[in-house]
Amino acid sequence: MFYIIGVGPAPGFITEKAAQILREADCVFYEDYTGPIDVETLRRYARSPPTRLTRRDLEDESGRRVLECLSRGKTAVLATAGDPMLATSHAALISIARSRGYSVEVVPGVSIVCAAFSASCLSIYKLGGVATVTYPRGGVYSARPYELVEQNLARGLHTLLLLDVREDGVFMPPRDAAEIMLKLEEREKRGVFDKGRPVVVVPKLGWGGRPAYLPLGELLGSDLEGPAVFIVPGGLSPVERECIEALSVLKSR
């Protein structure tokens, strides 16, 4: 049996079902490139020492070590931060395991999407989509975040922006994301990411961070650290505005 479990965005978010699976699994693996994971929690529950797998292990080598465990008739678990299949990072491994006759179960966890909207007090019913602010690839910045925010602003919808992870495993800090967004504005020139654009930043959710509501330009000198997510509001209702300003450590002027 192969389980993929989500342990939530930070310590204390693991579900009882995920904890029980860790207690019973023969092989426990985890990855920390899609999000920060609390390894101490894994060690506390797992009966065997957790093994870290890199992106290369899971993608380039198609989860070879997981499949080797399964081939010995043992139960394997792969733990991820947040909700394991909110993105499709591990869909290929599920397909491979099933094609070889292994049973697979996905155990959901608290996702960064739900947690960010809960922490920021914004309505998830107004979420118009999710994009990722990425570092340039080959010197080119992806326009996807710009285009999605532009579409959602026209419809009065919120946009959730995830932030990239560097090749060395360092999570993009909000100041880098703000710089990239402003560079996209310099290129596109349609008034989507100007310095005065109000954004909600949710840094280190569950690790002591609190949401910040402020103009995009003020993040250039920010010391907020990653991992973090941005929400670009598509227009705040009076209730949303009052709530986010009450919860936020910083407020737009």
Curated annotation (Swiss-Prot):
Its EC number is 2.1.1.98. Keywords: Methyltransferase, S-adenosyl-L-methionine, Transferase. The keyword Transferase applies. It is an enzyme of class 2 (transferase). Transmembrane segments: none annotated. It catalyses: 2-[(3S)-amino-3-carboxypropyl]-L-histidyl-[translation elongation factor 2] + 3 S-adenosyl-L-methionine = diphthine-[translation elongation factor 2] + 3 S-adenosyl-L-homocysteine + 3 H(+). This is Diphthine synthase. It comes from Pyrobaculum neutrophilum (strain DSM 2338 / JCM 9278 / NBRC 100436 / V24Sta) (Thermoproteus neutrophilus). The gene is dphB.
